[in-house]
Amino acid sequence: MADKKGSTGEKLLYCSFCGKSQHEVKKLIAGPSVFICDECIDLCNEIIRDEAAISEKEGGLAVKSDLPTPHEIRQSLDQYVIGQEQAKKILAVAVYNHYKRLKHLGKKDDVELSKSNILLIGPTGSGKTLLAQTLARLLNVPFVIADATTLTEAGYVGEDVENIIQKLLQNCNYEVDKAQRGIVYIDEIDKISRKSDNPSITRDVSGEGVQQALLKLVEGTMASVPPQGGRKHPNQDFLQVDTTNILFICGGAFDGLEKIIMQRSDKTGIGFGAEVQSKEERDVSEVLPQVEPEDLIKFGLIPELIGRLPVVATLAKLDEAALMEILVEPKNAIVKQYQKLLAMEGVELEIRPSGLTAIARKAIKRKTGARGLRSIVEHALMDVMYDLPNHKGVQKVVIDESTISDEGKPLLIYEEQPKVAGSN
């Protein structure tokens, strides 16, 4: 029964599920001839959450659809990343195999599949971070970017490596199961190389020490993370996160690695003359794909960490044609973004081919790659975007070579004013 008379004649209402009266619970919600209390609602929600977590664990990915194939992953990367065809292919296969492995966890088998973390080697602005971000968005898994240069050994001033896992948890609302299937991108991994091949009596707290700390995280460990972003202190309960199934992608420019590779392969001599240097710079894209573990060890990475990054993809330096394509082709191309911003003011933006060429050349001159394109376009449009809200009648903004190369002002095209009747 959902209701009956009390001793005072008051009509008492009861939960149809647990039988508690309206005085024993905070809230009683009525339905067609039934009632349910807030405690039973909480219990139902908990059961649903637990079942969803189990189902997600068995299914592997935190996505509803099936795992995309390497071809589908590559096609998605093509929409956002221009060029770097071989790197995209390597990444597509590695990521597909990683999440395929997770989908089959727990199944009894004689063969245990190892995790294949990834090392991306390429110059600044070649698309390393964008590739990792696009992969995480496609797979709908938690993603975090960490800067290796801010990391230090535990106990020293700086970020502890376990802070990376804390940020990953924050990005998925502290759902541990989701975090344990996420992607971590560690940028500037080359900046924590050993300072020399010989052990030093002084502590290398931001070099080899950090590599050793990262090694545990990358190969798989139980990381202790303070709940909800609190600071670590004794007598505190920690969240335990197993990093065994987190995919780690490490990226770096590795400036000078090509010299080490060429020394090993004896294809060319190493010198300090300008001619030799220009030759080396010209051949970097051809030399980097020949990288071997021994080259990375000589560069300053510890052998154990290299062993935990078995998949190596190299990215080429972007040329003028690639940078021009990046400006206009991808889904979220920079030119499309600024066209949308100006369209909100009712103004059309046109960047002529000569303007695109000038932007690409300036980025190459600055040695910033694709990363520098936005700042060049932003600088060219700064005054226009400042004045436009108060500037009536502008129909189109045009950027050409002179706007970029000579720091000239963009051309403003105004709407034709309607002629007043009777005027000459």
UniProtKB/Swiss-Prot annotation:
BP GO annotations: cell division; proteolysis involved in protein catabolic process
An example Gene Ontology CC term for this record: HslUV protease complex
Alphabetical list of InterPro entries matching this protein: AAA+_ATPase (IPR003593), ATP-dep_Clp_protease_ClpX (IPR050052), ATPase_AAA_core (IPR003959), Clp_ATPase_C (IPR019489), Clp_protease_ATP-bd_su_ClpX (IPR004487), ClpX_bact (IPR046425), P-loop_NTPase (IPR027417), Znf_CppX_C4 (IPR010603)
Transmembrane regions: none
Disulfide bonds: none
PROSITE patterns with a match to the protein in the record: CLPX_ZB
Binding site for ATP: 123-130
Residue intervals of the ClpX-type ZB domain: 3-56
Keyword Nucleotide-binding: yes
GO molecular function term, any single one: zinc ion binding
Lineage top rank: taxon: Bacteria
Binding-site list for Zn(2+): 15, 18, 37, 40
Keywords recorded for this protein, A-Z: ATP-binding, Chaperone, Metal-binding, Nucleotide-binding, Zinc
Pfam families cross-referenced by the UniProt entry: AAA_2 (PF07724), ClpB_D2-small (PF10431), zf-C4_ClpX (PF06689)
Oligomer status and interactors: Component of the ClpX-ClpP complex. Forms a hexameric ring that, in the presence of ATP, binds to fourteen ClpP subunits assembled into a disk-like structure with a central cavity, resembling the structure of eukaryotic proteasomes.
Function (record text): ATP-dependent specificity component of the Clp protease. It directs the protease to specific substrates. Can perform chaperone functions in the absence of ClpP.
Family according to the record: Belongs to the ClpX chaperone family.
Protein name as annotated: ATP-dependent Clp protease ATP-binding subunit ClpX
Organism listed in the record: Ralstonia pickettii (strain 12J)
Lineage, uppermost ranks: Bacteria, Pseudomonadati, Pseudomonadota, Betaproteobacteria, Burkholderiales
Gene expressing this chain: clpX
